[in-house]
């Protein structure tokens, strides 16, 4: 299978409600998102004109408009966290989530959004979201 991957970066802060470790506090990460797609219509010998699965520029535009622009330099907190910390409600760039904004939940959200936005000719085959250099969640 031929797979095309593009890597994206964004900065985001979060906190995990009900967790006893350090991640219960608001803190940020430099996220790295790997998006891998394939075509549902690939010929094993070659790719017909224009010769690529998707233009990297078009993939970048899609990811930036649906994911990066939404989360970059934002604070993402669960409704449960905000219920216990009402003074944060007026923070600029705050995104309220139904669930805890863990790397796993972020990745599942990204999968849902991209699956809905990709054309029928494109198939999402893998996502990897690094929360730190050596810690990440992966969907395959």
Question: Over which residues does each language-model region extend?
Answer:
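Charge-rich, low-complexity N-terminal segments
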Residues: 1-140
